[in-house]
Amino acid sequence: IYAVFNEKTTIDANEVRYLAKTAQARGVDSAGIVFQTNNDLQIIKRDFGSLELIGKTKNFSNSKFIAGHSRLVTNDVKNNQPVVKEELIVIHNGIITNYLEIWESIGLKPETELDSELIPVLFDHFTKKGLSDDDVVNEIFNICEGVISAILIAPRSNKVHLISNNGSLYYGYKEDSFYVASESYPLTSMSLDGVTQVFGLFSYDYNFNFAEILVDDVITKKRNYLLPKFEFMSSRDKLLERPEHDLKRCKKCILPETMPYITFDEYGVCNYCNNYTLKNIPKPVSVLESLMEPYRRKGSRDCIVPFSGGRDSSYGLHLIVEELGMNPIAYTYDWGMVTDLGRRNISRMCSKLKVENIIVAADITKKRDNIRKNVTAWLKNPHLGMISLWTAGDKHFFRYCEDVKKETGISLNLW
């Protein structure tokens, strides 16, 4: 997400290009912008990156404001941001994982399969009940699971609402201009004043003075690497066998009786546990806590935690926040093999723990093509020792982790 607002003069095109370029770190498959042309609010959505979109939109620099988005396309070909609903314009980062249940609970039906559509609907729904803007946002956060970091433009009430339940949204000022970005680095690198992280709601007054909202959405690319839509087929489901297993397991490590060479003693403990020799002496947690002390920053982020959304990294993030009391930024490298479930877990964990999530996305088309080549090459002469070829594409993970540390000024990353 990026945005610039100025009521006195037109926006600086070079600043917009810079913000659009930094936004592309989250993906270049799809982009969208909203800006003012004469008396109308113009929304343009395309299936390429934000910098290219800005370059092909010649009249954006005549506007006094612009807000945009750049994203990775994983399972939907639609250029879905910004979202327009109830005369509200929303640009959203994150995933609302329980959006279908919420639609059912409020007795309304979605027009699209997009979870972000729910944000303006809920904002309008609770506003009509007479709630204040702060209470409306709190209600949205209370019923939604997953990350919500969004710009919500309410042109009829001349308001720009910044909302975030995990801190992945920042704003700053320079002279008469107001700037917004998903991360702090683009704003601090522009030497803005008062760069602030959003938790909850921050509202900015802006006089839009418009007639109508125009939407220009064009899809030109056919993407054959997206996740197929799940379709339940009862005829195929009947072919599946789901036998109930009653396996004997080790009382300590839960290894099953199907494990090669396993035996159990009279207490139900396996031979692997009985013969295990401790390789080192675990130190108490207090030692780890003392190692963290020099890195702690009261009230600000103090470490980077690489985060895939899997079981191990999710538990690790929980320990770092809840047990060690650190204030991390979760860093995710999406290289084409992060699953849809992984992305949803990332959204759930970061919202629950109120952890900012910085996402760096690869060129998915190229990455998946390389993965296919590596797997094909391995299959010609399969060997267990060479199976690491399958994950060769994720090694940029380490490089971008160092970039994130430099941009945030954080020297510690915890694995």
Predicted features by range, described:
Residues 1-227:
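Conserved short alpha-helical segments that host acidic/polar catalytic motifs at enzyme active sites
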Residues 28-30, 167-170, 231-236, 373-376:
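A broad, low-specificity signal for short, low-complexity segments enriched in glycine/proline
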Residues 142-144, 244, 297:
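Solvent-exposed loop and beta-edge segments used for protein-protein assembly and interaction
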